[in-house]
Regions:
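SAM cofactor-binding core of SAM-dependent methyltransferases
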Residues: 1-43
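Class I S-adenosyl-L-methionine
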Residues: 35, 44-47, 51-185
Length: 185
């Protein structure tokens, strides 16, 4: 190693819930100071630098759409192995705003929100406030205030129909960095 003092001072923690992915990672990532965690409650009380490299876009999201001035939560209705469709059900957006503690619907017609993203950000920021540190988020996203539908399905490096290839593709979305900054306030 070119930086032995730095290497010896670092303790690497990898958050991974999947046993299969842990097995693959342990095979490919070697080091005595590496530990795998299933949740952030197992962190040490030490200064930490969190690196979220395409982490948040893998978390499940909820979508909300305003139609005729009424908010709806978007669901996927399974019809058969080869057919699904969107189903929009009326939703009281104030419930979501109570949860996030700000008016998320202000000047919006579409919202993508991940409850898990909010939870992880809160846990990470609590750790940073107590123990010092920082966070680097590396992901596809946008900074505009107006949220949009960014959900996408990718299979074999090509975009596919989200409703048709969900069992054989990577379903992801672009992060709203504006929303993340609002969650962090």
């Amino acid at each position: 190693s070119k930086f032995p003092k730095f290497k010896n001072a670092c303790n690497v923690k990898i958050l991974e819930k999947s046993k299969l992915m842990r097995k693959i990672q342990k095979k490919n990532i070697k080091g005595q100071r590496i530990k795998w965690l299933s949740d952030l409650s197992k962190l040490d009380n030490l200064p930490s630098i969190f690196i979220a490299n395409e982490f948040f876009d893998a978390l499940p999201i909820k979508q909300f759409i305003k139609k005729n001035k009424i908010w709806h939560e978007r669901y996927v209705k399974y019809i058969s192995k080869i057919k699904s469709e969107y189903l929009d059900k009326p939703f009281d957006i104030k419930k979501l705003e109570k949860k996030v503690k700000f008016k998320i619907s202000y000047k919006q017609n579409f919202i993508e929100y991940s409850p898990l993203l909010s939870k992880y950000l809160k846990d990470i920021m609590d750790s940073i406030k107590i123990n010092d540190g920082g966070i680097l988020i590396i992901d596809y996203g946008y900074t505009e205030k107006e949220m949009k539908n960014t959900i996408q399905s990718i299979s074999k490096h090509k975009y596919t129909d989200v409703l048709k290839h969900y069992g054989n593709s990577d379903i992801t979305y672009n992060l709203s960095f504006n929303l993340i900054s609002r969650i962090l306030k």
